[in-house]
């Protein structure tokens, strides 16, 4: 199996690391690639940083109108090759083709927003702020920036950062997850066609050694990360200790509240899509479904909807849910289901160890539903990152808000209702960075920041939109005095 190459300084280069790890199709366990993994990947990082640092001085001087021109072409190339990239995502990540296509569309939307950088970078000016004095603020790029990407959205999440960073005048390095490196390889085949100076955008493969090399290199000025809370905390602490600007998106345990006045059919469809879409492997997946009052009807409807969901290989257009990423992930999810039963929960729908014809070795779990779990138990409070729904019954909206705000995470909270008063109360009081009203996946569009609170985010500025512009630039305030007359000249 050929080892995937890095892309450094505008050239495809072989890694200095001889040890490799296989890239596995999670539906079949077929080996579909290999990436370098080991201490010598730090040498690859050094080469990528040198290339990016070498390109920065000239790239930052390119007018912003010129810097965004390659992004227009990148958008067109992504649109042209969207189906090919989507199929690659499905092969290595496991999600359905429909989900993979949607992922690429979100990537394209971020490129479109970044194309507006000539306006987004406009700053502030105050004329005659004091007699004869003008004051203004300018934005300048940071230098070499890097993205450490997760496995679950290999085609989208790097685009929360990449187009904004280079449009602001920075140079960039992407380190994809070693589990799903093929998607970025496809993207970089398109980047290679852009009219960009060598070293502006670079790709390096690897694992923890690669990450640590990026966190420790003095010429890397900013780090963007998305992944688990445990790793996000590590990235933030180590990056900040080395003087870097860091944004680190962590995990989640997302609650959805359903009031008695909610539209039944709409709520059921949207909630089941949120819980089981992408096999539950997304940081905005609903997990704890809270019904206010006795709502046996919606519980039955959720059960029937989940039970009918088709599970299988994502390239089959009829499939509605694919596998989870690794056997270890499946084992962890199954352990948490077992734990829920041990905690006194009732298993309404058991998705463990399904038989998927033709894909018996795949990492499959069918939709699973638990109810009656203790509110302070491990399963209710732990991010499962799999297709598991926990049903909770509470008496009032206030009780639901108290429960939501007692959690350690704060990525998303959603409410289903036809009451404007309850919607306004919920969006004001729920302690989460992304709020959905009659929405099951409150994913911000590219113009808005992907906001996480509490242990779902470490940092100050998020990805996407204006937050990305602020993250990838530093401000400089200039105060100028221009007297009408000079009393003396040297």
Which stretches of residues belong to each language-model region?
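Hydrophobic face of amphipathic alpha-helices that form TPR/SEL1-like repeat modules
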Residues: 1-34, 352
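Residues at or immediately preceding the N-termini of alpha-helices
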Residues: 26, 42-45, 64, 82, ...
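Glycine-rich loop-to-alpha-helix module at the N-terminal edge of alpha/beta enzyme cores
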Residues: 32-121
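Short, well-ordered beta-strand elements within core beta-sheets of diverse protein domains
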Residues: 33-38, 54-61, 147, 256-259, ...
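ALDH superfamily catalytic-core signature
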Residues: 230-374, 398, 437, 482-489
